[in-house]
């Protein structure tokens, strides 16, 4: 029964991915011109994206080391469900109704996939769809402002980059065939530039750089094997660094 359910899930995800590849990326669809989002909306988006990333990283990490923390994954799914309901209520003027329905359906598919025994087949189908969950929400956030290193402007975007980089690294440690190496390198360079700018201002920069250096040293190089324990280092240090950004 479990094998049949897993096969069916793979089929559904393959169909969903095929639909995604045959249509424009959700993040590029039209949004109503309402000006910048509020601080509360930025916080809501980043909270959801963090839970979203923690869930995916936890699933991928359990596949890498063969040990799944089901209680933690269950808790993250519940948190994600609650935050998604808030997103539907608070961002309905930003995302069209049909697009919001697609966003919720994709989140549900990804969340359901994390209930299965981790396999590379599921992960390879799940991760692109997970990006389609994050993309339209990330598109609402302000751009990273390297010059305004000490301010709050762009903080949500930096946290999004951090969460994406965390997922990239953990995924690469498991599958060793990450298809978005260039994107991971771009995120790494952008965050490093911002952290160096913060360090020059001397406000918490030393602590940030210390955590970043630990995180960056665990990131896999292109098509290279991860160091022993690197996936766990990426997850623990990445989540700590996320909170400091």
Map each language-model feature to its residues.
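Short, flexible coil/linker elements and helix-boundary hinge sites characteristic
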Residues: 22, 63, 98, 115-117, ...
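Heptad-repeat alpha-helical coiled-coil/4-helix-bundle sensor or tether segments in soluble regions
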Residues: 70-132, 190-244
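N-terminal export signals
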Residues: 2, 8-27
């Amino acid at each position: 029964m479990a094998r049949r359910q897993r096969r069916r899930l793979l089929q559904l995800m393959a169909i969903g991915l095929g639909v995604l590849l045959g249509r424009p990326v959700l993040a590029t669809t039209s949004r109503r011109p309402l000006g910048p989002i509020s601080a509360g909306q930025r916080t809501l988006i980043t909270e959801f994206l963090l839970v979203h990333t923690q869930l995916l990283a936890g699933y991928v990490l359990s596949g890498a080391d063969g040990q799944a923390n089901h209680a933690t994954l269950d808790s993250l799914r519940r948190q994600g469900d609650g935050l998604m309901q808030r997103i539907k209520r608070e961002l309905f003027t930003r995302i069209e109704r049909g697009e919001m329905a697609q966003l919720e359906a994709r989140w549900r598919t990804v969340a359901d996939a994390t209930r299965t025994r981790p396999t590379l087949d599921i992960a390879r189908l799940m991760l692109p769809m997970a990006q389609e969950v994050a993309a339209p929400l990330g598109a609402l956030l302000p751009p990273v402002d390297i010059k305004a290193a000490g301010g709050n402007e762009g903080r949500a975007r930096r946290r999004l980059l951090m969460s994406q980089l965390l997922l990239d690294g953990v995924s690469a440690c498991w599958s060793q065939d990450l298809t978005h190496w260039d994107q991971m390198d771009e995120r790494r360079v952008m965050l490093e530039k911002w952290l160096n700018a913060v360090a020059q201002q001397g406000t918490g920069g030393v602590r940030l750089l210390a955590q970043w250096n630990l995180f960056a040293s665990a990131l896999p190089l292109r098509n290279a094997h991860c160091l022993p324990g690197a996936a766990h280092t990426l997850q623990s240090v990445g989540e700590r660094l996320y909170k400091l950004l």
